[in-house]
Amino acid sequence: MDKADTSAAPVGASSPIPIPIDQPQRSNSQQGSIGNGSGSHRTPGHIPTHRQSFAENLRNPPPSPRAQRHLSLSQSAIQELLLKNPSSKQPNPLFANRDWRDVAVGELVTQDDVKWADLDTSVEEATMLLLRSSPANVVHVREKSTDNTPVSTFDYNDLNAYILVVVGLAHPEDDEQVALYDEIARKARERVAIPLRDIQPICRKEVLVTFSADEPLSRGVEVLGSGIHRVFVTTGNGDVIGVLSQLKVLGFFWEEGVSFPEIDRLYPVPLRDLKLGTHQIIAINADRPLAEALTLMSNEGLTSVAVVDNGMNVVGNISTADVRLLTSAASMPLLESTCMHFISVILTERGVERGQDSFPVFYVNPYSTLAHTVAKLTATQSHRMWVVESPSPSPSVPGTPLLQPVSSASSGQVAGATPTTPATTSTASGTPALSTATSTGSTIVIPSAVPTASLPPPVSSSVPAAALPGAHLSGRLTGVISLTDILNMFARSSGLHPSDPGEQRARRRRSSSASMRPSMEASRPSAEFIRRLG
């Protein structure tokens, strides 16, 4: 956004990310992702020793938030947040009477967002930099320390991919990469420093786009509204001086929208009338193992996934940024715990950091205004909001979800229309099953093709969905609205021509399942992509 003792989920690690012990040899992806087909699967083993985490090295363990708990965002606070529309503010003199399309991208960025690592920097060191990079959530990777031009990046998606390789849940597409994956896991197990250079082939790389600081914001919004998550802003000689991210641009439009009538007039409009978002979503049942959610995000090229109960009601959100809680050996049992349990760990960790509980605010409904949606996105620093309807009152779905396994679907994709033929996959027992509609409507659950039978039982009981703050305030999942969707609409409503975001989404999915080239060329912008935006 997304109970165990907080010591089970420390933030960071002083060793090169958690390592399972006694791992069998890895084989290619034809033998399954999480299942134990032909000995290829390696579940996290017993960790005999515990090395201090990043957090333990940086600060003394804080007192437990259990002693005094209160919601950080009460209903009144949420209402106040949503009523604080910048449209009621006086225009900022810096942007008054200006066309937002003529604002220079350099006016929105700061040098503080730029964190550097070299290709020879260890994954451990890069992870520490990443944990400190908020709100940019990215580390720039350069060839050598004297360079000021990135050749790659390191973000939470890459950290997730690395952890999946280390614990044996990621599988290469060909025999050539089998040796690479095994070598990375071996070095991590032996606590040998692994340079970022070595993990480039396993990381899914987005196109690297750079703009000069004097480029107009219209160009930046066209690119970001086409599905690119960030743009590097450079000086005339090519040195990076800032990062223009989707979230930064949306925050700018939220704070300064009163100066731009084309943007400000859209805020009072309901999402239903704007026809924003998509009904094709990927969700996972709350009772499924966390390892399955992480694998699902990696395979599908996602930064977050909705967590739902048996009635398809949204009960939480897990993002790749949450893997920061898995960067120590002691946190490995969390991979075997349920998604619902991990959500409770996320909320507890936020309580430790802030001294109070967090109230999950990660959903909107079709009648929410754009202002309501953007307020939540900027306040929570989220990349998407789940669109929900009223909570499912179906007699077949208890008011307090029991979170028992669903025989027809463990994790899956919510599609916008019922397929003409039933989708076949495997249940938790490994036998074929047909996906069935969760209601009489058109939304169905398509089970994941990722088998989960080999994962051990959760190490602790799942926290009931009804026990979490806000559990009764969400509703049935029907869609999703992303930063890309909103920026794409802003661009089109202002006469710009962004590319179809679906192209970038498809590219991320392809690059997640295909063998990655071990070179920097895969991450450099293609001439064709730049021409389409020009």
UniProtKB/Swiss-Prot annotation:
CDD domains: CBS_pair_SF. Keywords: CBS domain, Cytoplasm, Nucleus, Repeat. PROSITE patterns: CBS (PS51371). Residues 406-438, 512-524 have a biased composition (Low complexity). InterPro entries: AMPK_gamma/SDS23_families, CBS_dom, CBS_dom_sf, Ssd23. SUPFAM superfamilies: CBS-domain pair. GO terms for biological process: cellular response to glucose starvation; regulation of mitotic metaphase/anaphase transition. Pfam families: CBS. Its main location: cytoplasm. Residues 1-71, 389-438, 494-534 are annotated as: Disordered. The keyword Cytoplasm applies. SMART domains: CBS. Residues 109-173, 203-262, 277-334 form the CBS domain. GO terms for molecular function: protein serine/threonine phosphatase inhibitor activity. The keyword Repeat applies. It comes from the Eukaryota. GO terms for cellular component: cytoplasm; nucleus. It is found in: Cytoplasm; Nucleus. Involved in DNA replication and cell separation. Belongs to the SDS23 family. This is Protein SDS23. The gene is SDS23.
